[in-house]
Every structure is written in C-alpha cells, then in structure tokens.
C-alpha cells in the first residue's frame, strides 16, 4: 500500500511512530507537508502536486493536521479523497471535530451526554444565557482552542459576565459549560481505533489548575475504561465520522460525560502511559479500509 502521512514535522513522535509501524508492515510511506501540497480543480479531474512533482497513486492518507492549518490541511485531504485515496478520518469529519460547538450539537443529537453547554452572541442576552447554564463555577472555552489553551474557570457569576464581555470585545468565538466538580481535575482519554478503544489513560491536572491536558502540565497514567465509557467513546467517534481519535471523558455522578473528540490525538503520551503499540493498531486499521 502506498501511504501518505500529512504532517508539517517529520520529527514529531506521532509521525515517526506511524512511519515505523507502516514500514514494518511492508508499506511504502511518504510524509507530506500539507502546506507544500497544491492542487488543480477542474471538471475534467483533480490533481495534486508536491514540491514541483505530481502526486499520484496514493492509496491511503493519514492526516496529522494541526489546528493552525485546519482549513488548508483539510482542503488538501479532501483533494486526495476526490482523487480516490482512502483515509481513516475524512476531511469533513475533522472539520466537525475542530468546531467545538458543532461537535457538541452532533453528539447531543445522538444522545451522548456531556456537560451542559450554552452559546450566545448578543451582550443583552448574557444574564439569561448564564441562567440557562446554572450557578457557577463555569468553564469558558474558545470554540477552536486546543491543548487546554483558551479554557477559563470562573467561580462567580460576575466573573463569568466579565469574561464573556471581554471575549466578545475581542470578537472571539466561545462557548460556556457547567463545571463538574466531582471530576477533581481528572479526565479519561480513550483512544479509539475503528470500533474499539485500544488504550486509555487518566490525565490529572497539576496542583492549582483544572485542565488535565498534558500540554498544560497534566500527568497521565494507564487507566481501565469501563464498558460504558468505551461505548460512549466509540459512539462519539462514529457520531463525528472519525475512525481514529482521542475521546476525552470525565467521570461524573451522572456517568461519563464527553468533553472533546480530538481528530489528531498524540501518540507519545498514550503509548508511554499504557505500553500499547497504538501506531501499529492504526496501521492495521487502515489496511482494512483500503479498497481490495
């Protein structure tokens, strides 16, 4: 199988591990910087060039598209899809996952539980918007923030109003959620490949913080996901159309709640914490996706 990995940095752990796993299973692999891919779109067909040469015959594309290049990266991936390449995470599915509001709407429509979420635009509606959410603490999230950036905890209603006013003044797109205190700064990352959770780890926020993301200073240990948690993770992936993703859950008094579905989850933290060869599981999965 001729496999392309869309990644801006060939030295990243996740990219290197996918290359190693694919080559170990006999596949031809090439790393492509999405920003060096350019395309021709016409009624007579689609074509792609990379650094001055045509890209043809690609069977499978594994996207490792960073948030900062989501639009261009997904356009490149879509072009490969239109040229007949397969992918575990289609371009439209990645776009669904990157828009937190859209993702929450789609998950809720499938009956998947999550922290109560509110969204509004007009400053005149702020007081009523907060009443729909309930009493503080509240969590304010930028709609397209990643790795724990752009997430704020407010402990008083006045602070929530102040943050809302400040973000609107910056024309920022954001949503607000209830704070789940019983989680105690911990969440569960379930790594979904296909229709199963292949590894899971508990991430704990550092002292004095509530964000458990590893990039925000959190720590991780292997953790067993319950049957219910695994089912929620797989359902969440399917709701967005992803077959390789990280689903972040928190354990609450009313059961597992979905925080986020990450379409480009890192491999380093989960492989180190769990001792699972996740990269090979991904390659085994994409082998099944290839057309016979």
UniProtKB/Swiss-Prot annotation:
Organism of derivation: Stenotrophomonas maltophilia (strain K279a)
Q: Where does Mg(2+) 2 bind?
A: 260, 262
Looking at the record's lineage, which domain of life comes first? Answer: Bacteria
Q: Which residues form a coiled coil?
A: none
Q: Which GO terms describe its biological process?
A: protein modification process; SOS response; translation
A Pfam match: RimK
Asked if the keyword Magnesium belongs to this entry, the reply reads yes
Q: Which residues bind Mn(2+) 1?
A: 248, 260
Question: Which cofactors?
Answer: Mg(2+); Mn(2+)
Domain ATP-grasp: from-to ranges? 104-287
Q: Where does Mn(2+) 2 bind?
A: 260, 262
This protein's name:
Probable alpha-L-glutamate ligase
Record-level Gene Ontology MF annotations = ATP binding; metal ion binding; ribosomal S6-glutamic acid ligase activity
